[in-house]
């Protein structure tokens, strides 16, 4: 799920194509995550029958596997994962297996970046409120009636 607006990247499925592939969504299998020093990985196994309903332009015709899909494209096929995953390879002997990776500390870095952005936004709001209070106070002082001398 996206929390902000972005332009779709890749080739969007038609409503009819999407309906056909989503029939298989509950049968998609997600491996446990595994990692090396830089990345965490997982593989996603699509039902073999699903490959028959995925549009041909999603495939690399030279090797007979799915081509590397954009995040929007693989999400459009019904693959659901948290943010940061990148489709980087297809397993040629088993074309229904898609390999994904993301930086090892992606979620921690995302949380830290989100917290920093929220803190910055709060500081900006506080500064704006202080400026508004100062302006209101200045206007109020300017409007005070001078005491009359009798």
Curated annotation (Swiss-Prot):
A GO cellular-component term linked to this record: cyclin-dependent protein kinase holoenzyme complex
The protein's matches in InterPro entries, at most eight in alphabetical order, are given as: Cyclin-dep_kinase_reg-sub (IPR000789), Cyclin-dep_kinase_reg-sub_sf (IPR036858)
The biased composition feature labelled Low complexity covers 115-137
Coiled-coil boundaries? none
Report the GO molecular function annotations: cyclin-dependent protein serine/threonine kinase activator activity; histone binding; protein kinase activator activity; protein kinase binding; ubiquitin binding
Gene Ontology terms: biological process: cell division; positive regulation of transcription by RNA polymerase II; regulation of cell cycle G1/S phase transition; regulation of mitotic cell cycle; regulation of transcription by RNA polymerase II
Keywords in alphabetical order: Cell cycle, Cell division
Q: Where is this region: Disordered?
A: 115-150
Described function: Binds to the catalytic subunit of the cyclin dependent kinase (CDC28) and is essential for its biological function.
Miscellaneous: Present with 8780 molecules/cell in log phase SD medium.
Family (UniProt): Belongs to the CKS family.
Subunit and interaction comment: Forms a stable but non-covalent complex with the CDC28 protein and with a cyclin.
Protein name in UniProt:
Cyclin-dependent kinases regulatory subunit
Organism for this UniProt entry: Saccharomyces cerevisiae (strain ATCC 204508 / S288c)
